[in-house]
Amino acid sequence: MGCAYSCCLEVCCGEDEIVYPRMPGESTVCHREREKPITYHWYHWHPGHIYPRVASMEDYDEDLVQEASSEDVLGVHMVDKDTERDIEMKRQLRRLRELHLYSTWKKYQEAMKTSLGVPQCERDEGSLGKPLCPPEILSETLPGSVKKRVCFPSEDHLEEFIAEHLPEASNQSLLTVAHADTGIQTNGDLEDLEEHGPGQTVSEEATEVHMMEGDPDTLAELLIRDVLQELSSYNGEEEDPEEVKTSLGVPQRGDLEDLEEHVPGQTVSEEATGVHMMQVDPATPAKSDLEDLEEHVPGQTVSEEATGVHMMQVDPATLAKQLEDSTITGSHQQMSASPSSAPAEEATEKTKVEEEVKTRKPKKKTRKPSKKSRWNVLKCWDIFNIF
């Protein structure tokens, strides 16, 4: 029977199939061995392992090895410094047009050319790429509101200002003049503001500030004139030391003589500073203070008067007498208590203690409960219930 069953299985199954004897409880369906999928790992097969063929340097021509020029390569332009500068200036001009400052910049440029004596050929070519000139440097220090409106006129004093005085100008003076020319008035009286600026708005009246709207040329002339006046007043001269002393408040010689008359014992430094330090001996106070001290404490010494402290002086004989009196009174108090009465008092005290011990009831001996007893456990639970 077993041979017939095995033959039947061989006929049903193909040659490639592996036949196993059927186990009890196993289905009669033929089980084939599962084939594992073939996986190609990266170290077995990878596109990166297909290396391209590396050609030798002999294949390259010398013309190909040379640097690519702007004519050979599309989209690449070799720009020199002049072209780059012109591009940058054009970009700046475009930005000025966007900010509505192109006309102002044009006025600065024309004023700079006429004031510095630039030749006609350079004026035609333009001053693109040149460093900022003194008028433009001055314009950079001005506030934005003035920078939009001020233009530099072409006059003779402008050339002198640029050539001589502008490098010596201080930032503080420029800012002071600029703030003065903006026309900001902070007068607290509205009537005065209305007199100076009748076209004042409601907001300007409320804030007590009026913005002067003037001609840009007039503002520029006022600005340059004030700066020139301030710089011409300096002229690089040193200040007189006497004037410096006077400005600092140092007294003059005549004032020093007056000080010597008032305070004859004054030193030179005290005369210069105008301060006199009174030298007083600590052991010799003022006469009025001594009189007051003598009135209150007649037996006071000179040092006690100076320090304001008086030490009481007592006769030693009086002190000895007081000491003897105190010792005598103490001995009398001790002798008043008789020596024979002491043992009797001790005996009575002992008898009282013995009687109290006899009459005292014996205490009951109570056993201390252990920590694990029921009573202690209940107490613990009561504590927990309280909380």
Curated annotation (Swiss-Prot):
Annotated Basic residues bias = 360-374
Question: Entry's Pfam families?
Answer: FAM153 (PF15722)
Stretches with biased composition (Low complexity): 336-345
Locate the compositionally biased regions of type Basic and acidic residues: 347-359
InterPro entries, per database record: FAM153 (IPR023249)
Give the start-end ranges of region Disordered.
233-256, 327-374
Tell me the superkingdom of the source.
Answer: Eukaryota
Record-stated family: Belongs to the FAM153 family.
Which protein are we looking at?
Protein FAM153B
